[in-house]
């Protein structure tokens, strides 16, 4: 039996989980600050603020200009932002984001947000743009109820949200006001889910191991009647013949885990199927024996980004009570070099019986995902399986940091993904699933498949490899390579660090099932 690893001997997990556990940042008391939007033609969503709006236009603002007013209209800080001529979901997200960042930098603790006609997007922009994560001592002090943090324990008290939001209602009509409040709260929940994915990806790898990721999942849903969490150990993994996961884990002192999370959002019937969600869970990827360059290797703490995205999506489904039955699985391990690590040239037999030659140990994600995809597509009656992974550097080369690369089998699933990504304000680009890429992986004389190809198109051959392990070959399936969008900032509501994309697209897809 493997050891538990240095981190579990020196670190009190429950301390950090108090910071990681999401909280819906909905303010319950009057806000100290306000975001107020005006149109280019000087129209304002609420005439109650006409006087300060007139002062704003006296400064001859340009489009998207933000002015900060102090101690006016009952608020300590009031930020006025001018919207674009054509108001849209995206422009509202952007306006709320920019204004919220200014208010936060000027000491705001609670912000009332003008709904601007799109209250959900106003909430998203404000809550996403003001996210941050740090384990610096001076940063951690803001989490505490007391002003002084004890030397012995940086996490002496539960971490409250440092910034909360409430909707500035612009209507006296009760039904409309309720609908706007509900939409605003949905935006905050979706933002909290994406921010959760960000935090899990940001968490240092000595804290976010396979064991601790599972511990966190159990904590996250411990009070939920709709979610069941199953943590499978090394013995179970061996019984399941998940040799891809066991082989990648061979170089690590921390044992692997296979996490299975069921969300029951509606009553089951004979005709209903599961929405299968699979996420890559490599908690740190050094490349193994085929070791990566040391520059920027620390970013590989986020190689479990697929697992973080899918777990956070399940959290959102549960919070929003979306009527769908979804199952999320992730194989969790580190990929490290050691005397017992897998070597180039090794041959293993996968869960579905196919033999695979390991030509490059840094192409480990597809090995563990192959077993996971086969498990979920064989053990569950799935109507579709969506897998997300920070899989290939080739994806960054192909699409940069703008689009998630989507390899999709099934036109209906692609249509749903494309529509969902548009609704979420995310960007997807369809990539080719073609048998020609698979042929490039069958050149080994020792095994059915090789885990890499020498012919280029690395993101395409990786997708073709994973597809081989579907239990039903015609099953609707999407492989989302999120390596390019893992930590790149694209919009004004993004911030430094990991992106948490594409959590909100997964939520939108689930709504359509």
Swiss-Prot record:
Binds 2 Zn(2+) ions per subunit. It comes from Schizosaccharomyces pombe (strain 972 / ATCC 24843). The keyword Lipid biosynthesis does not apply. Pfam families: Peptidase_M17 (PF00883), Peptidase_M17_N (PF02789). GO terms for biological process: protein catabolic process; proteolysis. Zn(2+) 2 binds at residues 280, 285, 303, 364. This is Putative aminopeptidase C13A11.05. GO terms for cellular component: cytoplasm. Its cofactor is Zn(2+). Zn(2+) 1 binds at residues 285, 362, 364. Its EC number is 3.4.11.-.
